[in-house]
Amino acid sequence: MSAGAFRLRALARGFVRRGCRVRVVTTTPPPSAPPGAVEEPGLRVSRFPVLRDRGGNVRGYVQYLSFDIPLAFRLLFARYDLAVAEAPPTTGMVVSVVSALRRKPFAYYAADVWTDGVISMGAPGLVVRLMRAMESAVLRRAASVLSISDEVTDRLVELGARRDRVATVGNGVDTGMFSPDGPAKDDGAPYLVYTGTMSEWQGAELFASAMPAVLERHPDARLRYFGQGASEPAIRAEAARVGDRRIVLGGVVPPAEAAEWIRGAAAALVSIVPGIGYDFARPTKTYAAAACGAPVIFAGTGSGAALVRDHGLGEAVDFTTAAVSDAMVRAIDAWRSGGGEEERAARAAWVQANASLDAVGTNAADAVLAAIR
């Protein structure tokens, strides 16, 4: 499951806890996906197939349309009182138009700012203008907009959202799934782990580029990636150069398995490419790692770095190969020296108290329901 899937499941559960009947309209998972969870009481899931890229992602205009067009017809003939849409803004626009035709309220869950995302990828000016127009229209029309941080809220208001309609509900992780309690992987040697999406704006290949310097100090160390994304080709190329399976791409794994790898790691790796419009981001993988007790190495600046630094979740460093490799070496040194149990417990306790996804989901559901009453 992606961070977005966890977030939406928490929202759906929040609605169920408030006595709502919830229907989730989503995609049929790709064949490579791990088995999904069974349906829960009060929550019905409807799936239909979509076009995907070679990596199994719903990524690109044609792929989005393969979801959005059938969605429009499903919403036109479905019985509902309220719709909640998540990004991309193309999906938000479909929900906005159908809801207007049917005179139903809708909410928009803005975990990311897509206009900034397409700018960071170097998209043509026309694409940026179209994305900005769609995102702004959706934000203006939504009865409620859910934001994950104050920084995202400010950016949403700049794009046209009414501040009094934006609820900053925070972000978090499933602390039942991601916790220090449970089995931990043993790789026979120290390893560092990156879990989740490897997009252009995360720059996950930076850690692979740092591995040669790490191996000079710790020749038996290994770097493991779990997930998928645009950085995979660059990571595979670096893995081939390093050789000896020192850098391993493990694909998409179930969340429970990801938690096992995190628990056993010398450190969990998180990154945001600075200066491309995503410095406000606080990746969910930071919370997941800290919830398992693992120290976080965050490469980048802005809100994500402050989160790690201010709450003792690990180490925030510059987005450079030298800074990252030094931090990775320090993490392995600490792992070899043993101990650190108090720090692991403190990290997990902070997430439990401040970033439980159950609490986020309930707060989000309450904000949406309050907006339509």
Regions found by a protein language model. Give the residues of each.
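Membrane-proximal helix-turn-helix segments that form the acceptor-binding/catalytic region
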Residues: 13, 72-73, 79, 93, ...
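Conserved donor-binding/catalytic core segment of Leloir-type glycosyltransferases
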Residues: 184-212, 224
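Nucleotide-sugar donor phosphate/pyrophosphate-binding loop at the beta->alpha transition
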Residues: 63-66, 104-107, 115-138, 175
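Carbohydrate-associated surface elements
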Residues: 28, 151, 172
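Nucleotide-sugar-dependent
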Residues: 202, 254-261, 268-290, 297-307
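Nucleotide-activated donor-binding/catalytic signature segment of Leloir-type glycosyltransferases, i.e.
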Residues: 189, 233-260
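N-terminal subdomain of nucleotide-sugar transferases
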Residues: 1-46, 214, 358, 373
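A charged, aromatic-enriched C-terminal amphipathic alpha-helix characteristic of glycosyltransferases
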Residues: 319-323, 336-368
